[in-house]
């Protein structure tokens, strides 16, 4: 599972939150496939490999990417039951085993962000999750992820952010 997110020139690099979301999704995906528990040791091993693979240096940009990924993973772990229940509630017609591991990991990260990061508008979480799905899955999965996350957005007890008025 490789994406070229960090191999770009600095001016073209993706926002560190985007890279953090991808790292979190990749780590959750890896833990799902290996049935490994989330731990500092497995996270550090993953980061070592991901940092090399994606050329994430120890500079401020790389550090910010890792920090955001860690916050998302912590939210995924601490809120795991609520996230899984949310997925079950909004994906009523989908048996959990029908959701691919990549799409499930992407949903978990996006839902964790929507539930726990009030400074991030839900539409941003949705757009980012759909973009990540497009990079790691397929177009049909994009529609599925978008539909699930829009349904989650409808259940949130958060005020919508207003756009800037001209």
Annotate each predicted stretch with a short phrase.
Residues 1-135, 140-142, 146-166:
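N-terminal interaction/assembly modules
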